[in-house]
């Protein structure tokens, strides 16, 4: 496909395939591109090119992820597929590929398997808003078994607080579709219709309440203090009131100037690297790790539950397990804060390569919402990653 064909005339949605190993996630990804390519909506990608996913680094963690793009009549999609189970876990916990929705692939021959459960749980924990199911390999599965698998899946989804009764379950064969079989292709189109209609349009970053993490602080003599950073979400205009949140008691200020690349602007928006001039704020009162946000939209917290992934030794992580009371640094947005880890009941220690839910208490409060990602570090070296699942205080 020609480079210039990407137009913003359709809503953009990030999705991914999740599910148990060998249930057909990558084959399905290839089948979607091949079926849509026939309608001029995608560039066909074969199994091999998706399976040999390039390695990327996100928060100091190496993850293999394949990125595929395609369109339907209604939307533009960026689709991720991971070769290995560990890559999925790392991807979902680090938010390397933030998914607006996912296609859960389940083989009709097997039904739900351990990784099926784990991926559904992770999707719930890291706030993947919506799932659609593709029941694969139905051409070689026993029809009676397929009915049972569907019932079992709906129960499993409900158990993890997804709307199990309403989620579309599309039955088909990704391999048949890839081979050009008309019935197989029809199932893929049915799946894409389900994804189009059931997975909601995401709220764009620019439409969310304003937030900018402070990266650097300096003072302009006679004018005041400037906080610089990349605007994470929303937009800000001159003379708007903001709150400065995190590390110290929350305080209010007014933005009296917005600067970008040495030019003065009327407004800054999500994605911009900007400097905000703040009225009545001393240089000593603003520091890296705080956030500047729309008043009342974010609060500072010290105690939370999180889903974490701990790096293996081969990934540059710890060589030894850690125990209850472990005290690393937690890197949120732009700064490290020391915190202590409480392990769940019955868990004695955590080995490199494990993923689990823990409770964390920070020494200083950080502006956070559920879903915020962080890195776990020891003296600047990343040893893990996590996602805030529940705020306690």
Swiss-Prot record:
Q: Which residues bind Mg(2+)?
A: 26
| HAMAP family in the cross-refs | EF_Tu_B (MF_00118_B)
List the source organism: Pelodictyon phaeoclathratiforme (strain DSM 5477 / BU-1)
The ranges of region (G3) come to: 81-84
What are the start and end residues of every segment in region (G5)? 173-175
Keyword DNA damage among UniProt keywords: no
Subunit architecture: Monomer.
**Record protein name field:** Elongation factor Tu
Q: Which gene encodes it?
A: tuf
Family designation = Belongs to the TRAFAC class translation factor GTPase superfamily. Classic translation factor GTPase family. EF-Tu/EF-1A subfamily.
Per its UniProt record, what SUPFAM superfamilies does this chain match?
A: EF-Tu/eEF-1alpha/eIF2-gamma C-terminal domain, P-loop containing nucleoside triphosphate hydrolases, Translation proteins
Q: Which residues bind GTP?
A: 19-26, 81-85, 136-139
Where's the tr-type G domain?
Answer: 10-203
Whether Metal-binding counts among this entry's keywords is: yes
UniProt region (G2), positions on chain = 60-64
Function of the protein:
GTP hydrolase that promotes the GTP-dependent binding of aminoacyl-tRNA to the A-site of ribosomes during protein biosynthesis.
Report residue spans for region: G4. Answer: 136-139
């Amino acid at each position: 496909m020609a480079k210039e064909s990407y137009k913003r005339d359709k809503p953009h949605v990030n999705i991914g395939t999740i599910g148990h190993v060998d249930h057909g996630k990558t084959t399905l990804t290839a089948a979607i591109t091949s079926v849509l390519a026939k309608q001029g909506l995608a560039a066909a990608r074969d199994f091999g090119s998706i399976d040999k996913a390039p390695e990327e680094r996100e928060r100091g963690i190496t993850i293999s992820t394949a990125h595929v793009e395609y369109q339907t009549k209604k939307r533009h999609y960026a689709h991720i597929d991971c070769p290995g189970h560990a890559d999925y876990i790392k991807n979902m916990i680090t938010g390397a590929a933030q998914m607006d929705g996912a296609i859960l692939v389940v083989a009709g021959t097997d039904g739900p398997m351990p990784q099926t459960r784990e991926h559904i749980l992770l999707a719930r924990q890291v706030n993947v808003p919506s799932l659609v199911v593709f029941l694969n390999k139905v051409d070689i599965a026993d029809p009676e078994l397929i009915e049972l698998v569907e019932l079992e899946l709906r129960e499993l989804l409900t158990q993890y607080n997804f709307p199990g009764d309403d989620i579309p379950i599309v039955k088909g064969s990704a391999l048949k579709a890839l081979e050009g079989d008309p019935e197989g292709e029809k199932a893929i189109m049915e799946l894409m219709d389900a994804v189009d209609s059931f997975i909601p349009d995401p709220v764009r970053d620019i439409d969310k309440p304003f937030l900018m993490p402070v990266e650097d602080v300096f003072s302009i003599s006679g004018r005041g203090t400037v906080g610089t950073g990349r605007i994470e979400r929303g937009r800000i205009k001159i003379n708007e009131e903001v709150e400065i949140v995190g590390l110290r008691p929350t305080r209010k200020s007014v933005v009296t100037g917005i600067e970008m690349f040495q030019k003065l602007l009327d407004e800054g928006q999500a994605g911009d690297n900007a400097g905000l001039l703040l009225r009545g704020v001393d240089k000593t009162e603003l520091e890296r790790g705080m956030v500047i946000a729309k008043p009342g939209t974010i609060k500072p917290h010290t105690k939370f539950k999180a889903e974490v992934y701990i790096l293996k030794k081969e990934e540059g992580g710890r060589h030894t397990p850690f125990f209850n009371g472990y005290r690393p640094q937690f890197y949120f947005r732009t700064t490290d804060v020391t915190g202590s880890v409480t392990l769940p009941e019955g868990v004695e220690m955590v080995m490199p390569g494990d993923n689990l839910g823990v409770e964390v208490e920070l020494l200083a409060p950080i502006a956070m919402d559920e879903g915020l990602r962080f890195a776990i570090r020891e003296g600047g070296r990343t040893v893990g990653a996590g996602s805030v699942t529940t705020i306690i205080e």
